[in-house]
């Protein structure tokens, strides 16, 4: 199983419930295919670098997971078929990128615990 990271952008016209439902659809698809979700981050509504389909903002979502290479084709096919997804990018992490992502997650979680204690 390889480490993968995917970032996808959802259309900005979605409500919070619709956005969460779309994210849940893709994470459940990964789990059904035997992938292990390592990390999920909602980056929120952000400005796009350039307009896509006359939209200038979008909801960014990051998902890190471990899966077999065959899962990626299924995931990307579902991204292409879903009208809510504006763009997506999936790439395989090498061992250095996986280590960096783990350190970043640990640093982020330690900052959150410090904020909770204050």
From Swiss-Prot:
The protein, known as: Small ribosomal subunit protein bS6
Record has Ribosomal protein as a keyword: yes
GO biological process: translation
Pfam families: Ribosomal_S6
HAMAP family: Ribosomal_bS6
Signal peptide (from-to): none
SUPFAM superfamilies (alphabetical): Ribosomal protein S6 (SSF54995)
One GO CC term, this protein: ribonucleoprotein complex
Keywords attached to this entry: Ribonucleoprotein, Ribosomal protein, RNA-binding, rRNA-binding
Cited function: Binds together with bS18 to 16S ribosomal RNA.
The UniProt record lists the keyword Cytoplasm: no
InterPro entries from the UniProt entry: Ribosomal_bS6, Ribosomal_bS6_sf, Ribosomal_S6_plastid/chlpt, Transl_elong_EF1B/ribsomal_bS6
Family under the similarity heading: Belongs to the bacterial ribosomal protein bS6 family.
Gene: rpsF
GO MF annotations, alphabetized: small ribosomal subunit rRNA binding; structural constituent of ribosome
